Amino acid sequence: MMIHDLDMARFVLGEEPVEVFAVGSNLIDEAIREAGDVDTAAVILTTASGRICQITNSRRTTYGYDKRLEVHGSKGMLRVSNVLENLVESAKITGFQSALSQPFFLERFEAAYLAEMKHFVEAVSTGSTPIPNAQDGLRAQLIADAATLSWQEGRAVAIPK
């Protein structure tokens, strides 16, 4: 359930993670447990230089599709917030209220999917290598497999090179 987050983490970290520790539980849907998976999970990725990435996922939110990113560094912080259905926000004595997050990933990433397809077609047309490429997909899968093993065995796992 977090393969895309693991892939993105590689680019945000700027270097390959070398170790993963994962935890998970079933808090929402018994059918997911019966399928051998979790509905709530967290991983910590560590790089050789000591960079740390924490990813948390849940299969269900009550307020729309939740996808956020924060990067903290020695000179500041970068935050990518949820995309809301609209930008209207009201303020009253009881507090602030805004629109819901977009309800589904297709709405949230429509422009990104179109840009991705355009880039892929351009790469194929010009004979260049698309980004991400097959090696990027393989690396994300190796991290996911190591995270699954970590969750199953309850220990940190080295990510294969």
Each predicted region: which residue ranges?
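Active-site loop of classical SDR/Rossmann-like NAD(P)-dependent oxidoreductases
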Residues: 62, 106-117
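Beta-strand scaffold of nucleotide-dependent catalytic cores
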Residues: 54-57, 80-82
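A general structural signal for well-ordered alpha-helical segments in protein cores
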Residues: 5-6, 114-118, 144-145
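Rossmann-like dinucleotide-binding domain that binds NAD(P)(H)
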Residues: 1-52, 58-63, 135
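Structural motif
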Residues: 51-52, 75-77
